[in-house]
Amino acid sequence: MSLAVTLASTSKSRRALLAAAGVEADGVAPNVDEESFRNTMRANKLPVREQAMQLAELKAMRVSAKRPGLVIGGDQMLALGDEAFDKPADLEAAKNHLRQLSGKSHTLETAIVICEDGAPIWRHLARPKLTMRPLTEDFIETYVSSCGDALLSTVGAYQLEGPGAQLFTRIEGDYFSILGLPLLPLLDYLRIRKVLPT
């Protein structure tokens, strides 16, 4: 019998990526106060990539303590230098994100941790780098107005799989990781564990 796979998240995009790749996974909310946890990590001056990894691990551990099989926890944070960006709270914050990112390169610290029986057993960190073209104020206003609240579900206030592709001049790294899930290394691990055929 194959191991059960659970995604410690209610993220529709992560579940859709798994399903499209042939991985059946239940989605379970990890019930983590992410804002408080992030604030503590930032107060301790942890690097952004370490913040993403610790939050991914916490999510997976919380759900794994209650669910059998493999539990996948993920987190993605945007790093502009040493500054971490969270998902924008509203459309005005989305505009501010885009103003700050305009004409610069940033990294999406995309962490994934798998836990089994409440303990972490596998980790992966992908660090795609994206370079945004210089954006005019008119473009930012029009872009945010046309995309609307969908931008509030992403750390950079863009969705690369849609009109967000217009924002960039260069992308280095795995497309799936940009979408929030380092899918290819995850699939490799699931094959090792015989969740997927080899």
UniProtKB/Swiss-Prot annotation:
Reactions catalysed according to its record: a ribonucleoside 5'-triphosphate + H2O = a ribonucleoside 5'-phosphate + diphosphate + H(+); a 2'-deoxyribonucleoside 5'-triphosphate + H2O = a 2'-deoxyribonucleoside 5'-phosphate + diphosphate + H(+)
EC number: 3.6.1.9
Cell location: Cytoplasm
Record's keyword annotation contains Cytoplasm: yes
Matches recorded under Gene3D superfamilies: 3.90.950.10
GO biological process: nucleotide metabolic process
Keywords: Cytoplasm, Hydrolase, Nucleotide metabolism
Principal location: cytoplasm
Molecular function terms from GO: nucleoside triphosphate diphosphatase activity
Active site feature: 75 (proton acceptor)
Keyword Hydrolase: yes
Signal sequence bounds: none
GO cellular component: cytoplasm
Family per similarity comment: Belongs to the Maf family.
Entry-linked HAMAP family: Maf (MF_00528)
Protein name: Nucleoside triphosphate pyrophosphatase
Organism field: Hyphomonas neptunium (strain ATCC 15444)
Top-level taxonomy: Bacteria, Pseudomonadati, Pseudomonadota, Alphaproteobacteria, Hyphomonadales
